[in-house]
Amino acid sequence: EKYGVEPTYANMREGWMYHIRDRVWLANRAALGLMHLGFTPPFTGDENLNPHWYQIDPQLINEIWAYTAPGMISYAAGKSDWAARITSDSWAVSPTVLYGAMYADAFFCKDIRKLITRALRELPADDRYAIAVKEMIALYDKYPKDWVKARQIMAKKYYIDEPAMTKTIWNANLNGLCGILAMLYGEGDFQRTLDLSCAMGFDCDNQAATISGLLGVMYGAKSLPESLTKPIEGWEKPFNDRYINITRFDIPDASIEDMIERTYNKAIELVCSKGGKVKGDMVYVNPKAQFIPPMEFCIGPNPDLEIGQPTDYSFACRTNADFKWELVKGKLPAGVTFQNGKLAGTPTEAGKYPITLQLSAN
């Protein structure tokens, strides 16, 4: 609402630094620390800078990028990739991309297996998580009535035998696979899927929340058991229609119905901005919409060159590398060139070399 339906990384950094002050862990905490050092995403999630780049973090806060883009599967996947890189990198981004695609598709697809396989189109065939998801589907086919066996095999390969560097209960790949198994063995039943999400273990509360939300989109609010949405006598609306904030600075308590209405309005705004339209009580979406990251400079470590040592420093990152980069002011050290947002060559002279760069659309 404050920054529009396609915020910039600079906007995200500003919001994070203002609202997130405590109760933050792992990749989120490391990213926030890097923001306070002056960095912007995606450098805050870079595997060379964020020691927790491989953790689950972006899967937990991803839904909004997708349920505001109903039916716009590729758009939701691309935006999820962009957002995940605030905290994460490499294969740890992939579960977030898959969830993003599934959330967007869930408005129209009611078949669990089809939902998963269609979302896999948004990941490269050789992606680590994509390969592992296909393994989970094969396990389900082999042991359709034995989720314990499937979970045992999955945990052996992706937790017990995981390389020491990335072996944690919060590993993004591991927990993303737990979610897939819960979906497959839950077979569309909300309570069973929720129970299985918890039974899979590891960082299970987060998988339970993500998968439960996904089923809610697929089958609607009426599919949710009242024993869960109205557990206290006297509640007339789900969860008593109250969101109570206890963890984020200067975020007010709110009516859940009001939050839904505001989110719906943002979804309509986004749909219409990407070629969709509203006609009467019907909303038409553009399923071919693509997410193009906002054009912006992203701030990472300053270049630190050494005489006689080759450099390949890049000001450009994956979200702005395709724009036009120009050196418009200043002088480079002898032996160094600038092209496509990158420094290359071997400096031969010491000194300070202030430069001004310009970024524009091609």
Give the location of each predicted region:
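A short beta-strand micro-motif common to beta-rich folds, especially ectodomain repeats
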Residues: 351-361
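Surface-exposed or secretory-pathway low-complexity segments enriched in glycine-proline
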Residues: 319-341
